[in-house]
């Protein structure tokens, strides 16, 4: 479950326990801003320790939405590398082992050029992590938090000249990154189910899901599929748009979602839901719907008001009470 942090880190950790989440994803900063914190938020140690007590693992971080590793603008790409490197370094303080990012758009140049840029950016970001920095100035990560997270590239729905719509594009990124010295274990991939649907993959059909997984295994190896974003979709298949919906209530529906949740090749992978209304109690509603599908149950229809809730929040990176007023928020150096 993607945890909203708008009510504070401590409250978010307790919410994970209340709903029985087994894995969580968070933002370490505002995903819609370039500026990054220079010190960890208050409550971070308590947040991390509570998740350990609850045996919530893995913890994943979703990087800034502003990142575009594929674009031709050198300055913008360098800023993207700075922000992604900052988010990766800060992730260690949250106990995160995965940092998920959108690869971005080639902005009308070419897919091959975009792939080359992404691979080089990946190598640059991972090269900065070898020193074990915390991501915050003058703050050192202790031994228990010094492991470097895996960078995870998410598939795209296909709009706006995006890179990563096809499995072959991710495979080529991995190939170029390897040639630049990036070890296989440092770079992995995420399947966002709603994105795949938007890109034209029949995620409502078990046979098409199996075909997608077989192709991924041929091109990259299923060992490199590290994370699944389990989202239904309100968009049309192949629309190249990304519109998340409640579990089993969208166009993908119960059959496809159940097949993913019970697939033997996926049973050990973390599933994260980024569904609507997380701040309004629908985090538990959607988690319970996923559990019901695993149990083979038919889902009850959702009430009309369920479809009027806010989409998943992207701005609530940290609550005000987690921010030390003495600490300025600045752009990465």
Each predicted region: which residue ranges?
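N-terminal pre-domain/capping segments
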Residues: 1-63, 67, 71-86, 137, ...
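Aromatic/hydrophobic pocket-lining residues that form the small-molecule binding cavity
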Residues: 9, 44, 80, 84, ...
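Conserved, mostly hydrophobic/aromatic
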Residues: 16, 62, 80, 91, ...
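Alpha-helix-loop-beta-strand connector modules within alpha/beta enzyme cores
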Residues: 41-61, 118-130, 173-179, 252-263
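Active-site acidic/histidine proton-transfer and metal-coordination neighborhood
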Residues: 69-188
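Histidine-acidic metal/acid-base catalytic patches
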Residues: 135-139, 171-333
